[in-house]
Structure formats: C-alpha cells, structure tokens
A protein has these predicted regions:
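Terminal amphipathic alpha-helical/low-complexity segments used for targeting or macromolecular assembly
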Residues: 1-119
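Structural signal for interior beta-strand "rungs" in well-ordered beta-sheet cores
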Residues: 124-240
Length: 240
C-alpha cells in the first residue's frame, strides 16, 4: 500500500527500476550508433559505464522536468473551457502525451544520447499525430489544443506561454545544400516564436523568422516573414 509512510520507499524502488531500464536502452543506442559509423559492433565496458552515467544524470533532472510539465498541464487546463480537471488533462489530452515524450526526449538528447530521443518522440507522433522533434527548444506553459497534424521542426525555438492549435506547421522554407547537393545539417531553419504567441489551426510558418511576443497568427495562413510583437495576422475578409 502506498501512503505517506511508504511513499519514499516506493519512489526509491521505482527509480532503481527506471535506472536499469534506462541503462539498457541508452546502451543499445550507443552501440547502435557506433556500429552504424563502423567504429565497432561490440558493447564494451566503457559504453556500459557511459550508459550508467547518462541514466543517472537523466534521473537527476526528473524533478525539474516534473515542474515544467506541471506548467504545461496548467496551460492546457486554463486554456480549455471543456477541461474539468487537471487529471482529465493528464490522462485524456493527446498534447500532454506528445509534450511529455518531447520533454523526456529533449533532456536525453541534450545529454548526448543517440537515437533513443527520436524514437521517443516518434512513438508520440504515431499515437497522437503530433510531431515534435526532440531538438526543438520549448519554454514553459506550452500547450497544443486538439493537436492532430502539428509539426515542430528540429531548430524551432518556442518561448513561454505559447499556444498552438491543430494542423500548425513550424517548418523550414528551404534547405541549403553542400557541394554534393546534400542538405547541410544543423543550420537554423525553423521559426522562433516568442512569449505569449498564439497560432491558430492550419497556419504554416516557414523559415528562420521570428513571431514577436504577444503576436497572434490566424488560421489557414502561410507566413514566411517576421511578425512584429503584438501583431494580429489574419486572412483578408472576403468581399460581399
């Protein structure tokens, strides 16, 4: 039975189980990535030590991750009049599943864990229809309403208190190529959304542009230029 007297014991046991599982998965990622590069195909003791170190470091970040996820739940609850409780948001909202997977994957990626972060976000993508690359940088109180069809590219930067609706794409406008005609990796190519931005359904925002603080982007709009802070970008009204 879990109660106030036994909770610390249960947490300790589950953290130990988590550590073992993480070590196994991180080790698999490390071995896979080096075998692909042709360096080796054997998981050495040094890799096992590295996996254990990374797993321990990730676990140390769990309290901070929990705090930031709590802000995401709060944002979803406060932004949806249909939400009746925090519990409903946590268990029923696909965006929370996708954002949770992203937060976990992002921390693993920041630690240098190969492959596993992308697998984690793609699991959420398959389940929810929300595609968030683990390399994207996203602030607190982030929410996605409905969520289906949202795409957030690898070099996207999203501030605090940002809200996206279904079908929003934060994508690249073009891909610079090297001398062999292949895309150059790592170049910032996705949008920056500053604090308190709202982007409504099916808006497409492309390229390394900035959507300024407190701006609103209306639905079904294609945006490829900077949007000033506080601006409202909407479709031109049809003439009667």
């Amino acid at each position: 039975t879990i109660n106030s007297r036994t909770i610390n014991y249960h947490i300790g046991v589950n953290i130990e189980k988590l550590f073992d599982l993480l070590c196994e998965q991180i080790l698999a990622g490390l071995c896979f990535s080096t075998s692909i590069e042709g360096k080796c195909n054997v998981c050495s003791d040094s890799k096992r030590e590295e996996a254990a170190r990374l797993a321990a470091k990730f676990i140390s970040k769990l309290p901070a991750m929990r705090k930031i996820l709590a802000t995401d739940v709060e944002a979803a609850y406060n932004g949806d009049p249909a939400a009746e409780s925090y519990g409903e948001v946590i268990f029923c909202y696909p965006a929370i599943k996708a954002i949770s997977n992203y937060r976990i994957a992002h921390e693993l990626l920041e630690l240098g864990v190969p492959l596993i972060p992308r697998i984690i976000t793609e699991m959420a993508h398959s389940e929810t229809g929300i595609d968030i690359h683990p390399a994207a940088k996203i602030g607190t109180h982030f929410t996605i309403d409905h969520g289906t069809g949202v795409v957030i590219g690898a070099t996207s930067i999203i501030g605090n208190n940002v809200k996206l609706y279904q079908g929003v794409t934060l994508g690249a406008k073009s891909f610079p190529l090297d001398a062999d005609g292949k895309p150059i990796k790592g170049i910032p190519r996705h949008p920056i959304l500053e604090d308190n931005v709202i982007v409504y359904s099916n808006a497409t925002i492309l390229g390394r542009i900035t959507i300024g603080r407190d701006a609103t982007v209306g639905g079904n709009i294609w945006v490829t230029e900077n949007v000033p802070a506080g601006a409202r970008i909407v479709q031109t009204k049809a003439k009667k």
